[in-house]
């Protein structure tokens, strides 16, 4: 199962942070997927410019550290990947989660 906009009540930065997708088996999160748009790599006016970029980096670090502390594998997909590359990397990631004893 995939759960879009998944939240963990204890993962917060001012408010509860949303993860783009959680992969679940038997209602247990076995992996997280985050799609990182351009605003994750450089300031974009639409997303708050420099201040928004700094906050995005803080939220990304909180999410990274949260998953690491909970032993939840996380896949970050940069906006620079093509659709075909994204399909391939998600497929490989899913296989690694479901065949590595995580399921």
What are these regions (language model features)?
Residues 1-103:
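Nucleic-acid endo/exonuclease domains
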């Amino acid at each position: 199962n995939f759960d879009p906009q998944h939240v963990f009540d204890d993962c917060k930065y001012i408010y509860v942070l949303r993860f783009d997708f959680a992969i679940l088996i038997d209602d247990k999160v076995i992996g997280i997927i985050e799609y990182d748009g351009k605003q994750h790599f450089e300031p974009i006016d639409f997303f708050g410019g420099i201040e928004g970029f700094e906050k995005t980096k803080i939220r990304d670090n909180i999410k990274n550290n949260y998953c690491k502390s909970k032993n939840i594998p996380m896949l970050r997909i940069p906006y620079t990947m093509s659709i075909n590359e994204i399909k391939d990397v998600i497929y490989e990631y899913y296989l690694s989660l479901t065949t590595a004893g995580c399921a």
